């Protein structure tokens, strides 16, 4: 009954997504934000990590058709902190992915509680920031997003923290110490950080695109492990917009990543690299302003074409299929419309190993709502051009 306030009744013939929210055990209304995917306990299976804003952080594991919270250690669930962002990657090359929880108990500037950087010793989690050697490098600035960056291409990840009203952080492990290298790398800019993504955008290594609010976006070119800011040179600065969710996608199916980025109640962008400049090829339907929070690009229905999921807060979500030549075709999103959904984050993973991606959406901010979970209804009889 509680979940009916989020979803809409749509005939089966119109559904792109099947609603499988019933698979989530003990799915109570709550305030959630960012979602990540990781093998939390190194058991060979992925979990959805869901942040809680004054609620437990969750590690949703799959077993026999059910998603259940698999971690109950107090340092992980951290109910008394307000967690807004999460990323997971192996920063020390020990085979376990560390988990960075970004806490934000104030809108902007200085905050009370620092972030968590959780390591797993095979039995329990511990916070690397609680070690005395790392106390001088705590992030005590409000933030919005966090992403892992393999800047040297050697598998030793760093963590970029998009702060709001304070300098950007870039944490790496140096010996036994967690060091903020943002100043050394020249990326300690002060802005209204909102979203951040990393991948091979321009160089052969991990570049960084950061969508910001009340200021220009950043595009960092990875020059042998150092960063050069080129947003204005490549025409992705979008100075007068308020950036939100962003994703990387091979929009032209040509073997290179381009940038999908959104703006709060402003035009959404599909930046494609042409002649050493990014050109926005978004059509009227795709670019239509909305109260957007998250953008995801993935092939949900295994037809060889990527879909773009746009998660809005307080208004309907949208779904587009990227066809050949960068054509965006809006498709009926079906059960995942969520007209009254207060979307704050989302992630995709093949959580049950059946070869089809699940979509998990988190909600909150202005009201308590449960998580929702969707799976594409694949029509096997329909031909697919790209997979023949």
Regions found by a protein language model. Name each.
Residues 32-42, 83-93, 143-153, 194-202, ...:
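Beta-propeller blade termini
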Residues 23-55:
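Beta-strand-rich domains and repeat architectures in extracellular enzymes and scaffolds
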Residues 125-129, 135-172, 179-220, 229-231, ...:
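Solenoidal tandem-repeat scaffolds enriched in leucines and small polar residues
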Residues 31, 55, 82, 87, ...:
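Beta-rich catalytic cores
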Residues 16-29, 71-81, 127-140, 181-190, ...:
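Short loop/turn motifs that recur once per blade in beta-propeller domains
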Residues 42-51, 93-102, 153-162, 203-211, ...:
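Acidic/hydrophobic-patterned starts of short beta strands in beta-sheet-rich repeat architectures
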Residues 7-18, 56-71, 111-129, 166-181, ...:
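Beta-propeller blade repeat segments, especially FG-GAP/WD-type strand-to-loop junctions
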Residues 1-6, 382-384:
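Short, small-residue-biased leader/transition segments that mark boundaries at the very start
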